[in-house]
């Protein structure tokens, strides 16, 4: 149920796209994302910083999708998003007391300092690689191939990365702590998946728009 709620904007996006087209669907996704964050705030009286950042990305980049008609911008946008996240994660090593990934997951699991640093750099490498992969496919292959890569390739990379991350983290979790932390870990991973889902939503918006132009 939590994952379904996290994917609420994505589901509405696809429904609106089938019925009314890309621009109405993009507007619906923006409105749905704002409503989603507003609901979380009304329920919990607080919003995580990552939720605010991802909402801002959807509003700004989704708004750009509605206004701009430049195919080059559309194809570069997912790369800019991924590299932007890489910069945020890298910057968190120098601003604040903890890397941002540690702030997200510190209450759920206990890891050595070196493990948190390695985990953070795994995320940074993932975002950089995703950005490079997007540009490579966009410029080396036709638009149809790029759209397929955006819809299926990067989603597959994302799922594989989450699995690798889970295996890495599991090396440091004591079996005696599993039952106590199960619920919290599930909440943290749901939040992480939500963030990735929102980034993938922006990628889907780009892909569908470019496909329509073709």
From Swiss-Prot:
Chief localisation class: membrane
Domain of life: Bacteria
Listed transmembrane segments: 11-31, 50-70, 81-101, 119-139, 149-169
Protein's membrane topology: Multi-pass membrane protein
Alphabetic keyword roster: Cell inner membrane, Cell membrane, Membrane, Transmembrane, Transmembrane helix
CC annotations in GO: plasma membrane
Compartments in which it is found: Cell inner membrane
Pfam families documented for this protein: IspA (PF04279)
PANTHER family in UniProt: INNER MEMBRANE-SPANNING PROTEIN YCIB, INTRACELLULAR SEPTATION PROTEIN A-RELATED
Listed NCBIfam families: ispZ, PRK00259.1-3
Biological function: Plays a role in cell envelope biogenesis, maintenance of cell envelope integrity and membrane homeostasis.
Similarity annotation: Belongs to the YciB family.
HAMAP family: YciB
Annotated protein name in UniProt: Inner membrane-spanning protein YciB
Taxonomic source organism: Hydrogenovibrio crunogenus (strain DSM 25203 / XCL-2)
């Amino acid at each position: 149920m939590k994952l379904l709620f996290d994917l609420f904007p994505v589901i509405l996006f696809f429904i609106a796209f089938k019925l009314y087209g890309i621009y109405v669907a993009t507007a619906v996704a923006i409105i749905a994302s704002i409503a989603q964050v507003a609901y979380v705030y009304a329920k919990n009286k607080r919003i995580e910083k990552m939720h605010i950042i991802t909402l801002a990305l959807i509003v700004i980049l989704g708004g750009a999708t509605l206004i701009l008609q430049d195919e080059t911008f559309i194809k570069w946008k997912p790369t800019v998003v991924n590299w932007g996240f890489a910069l945020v994660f890298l910057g968190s090593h120098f601003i604040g007391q903890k890397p941002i990934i540690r702030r997200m997951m510190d209450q759920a699991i206990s890891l050595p300092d070196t493990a948190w640093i390695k985990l953070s750099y795994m995320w940074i490498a993932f975002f950089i690689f995703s950005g490079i992969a997007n540009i490579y496919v966009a410029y080396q292959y036709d638009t149809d191939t790029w759209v397929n890569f955006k819809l299926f390739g990067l989603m597959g990379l994302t799922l594989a990365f989450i699995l690798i991350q889970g295996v890495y983290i599991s090396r440091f979790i004591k079996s005696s702590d599993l039952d106590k932390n199960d619920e919290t870990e599930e909440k943290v991973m749901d939040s992480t998946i939500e963030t990735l889902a929102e980034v993938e939503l922006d990628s889907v918006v780009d892909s569908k728009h470019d496909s329509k132009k073709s």
